Amino acid sequence: NRAELQGKLGVFWHTQGSGKSFSMVFFARKVRRKISGNFTFLIITDREDLDDQIHKNFVKTEVIGQKEECQPKNGKQLRDYLQTNKSFIFTLIHKFRYDKGKKYPVLSTRDDIIVLVDEAHRTQYKDLAENMRTALPNANYIAFTGTPLLGSKRLTNQWFGNYVSEYNFAQSVEAGSTAPLFYSRRV
């Protein structure tokens, strides 16, 4: 039940190089196939190369069309896309930048917006993330990360909820997907 989760869909913790961007594709496809509704998937990254990589994976898997306009060029275009109920939007967290000292405006009160945040441990604890949550107060959020913030604060879990999938470095080495890493001090 989405209401009980308070917009926290969870943390998808898979080690680097394990295919998190394809997991985003599978997640979006499954939601569209299994749950009725007119969902908007907002895919957030913090680097242009990641934004392009994830967008290309959605194109290659034919979830979206090659020429579909879904990567806003600036904050204004992002706001326009959100208000026109596009199915998929790929953008940088930086497009939620706003004048210092001013409150970010609400862009949509829809509860069928699902925000997929790539590398959530890097961007989700400061002003830009707070602006995004102010802009989309009823959205549902899921984190994709290879490095969740752990320890006593467990910030990633506080912002996104419990783990929905875990595949850590040790599991990847054991499965043969990752070569083990050894360090030898020589100084």
Name these PLM-found stretches:
Residues N1-V187:
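RecA-like P-loop NTPase motor core of helicase/translocase proteins
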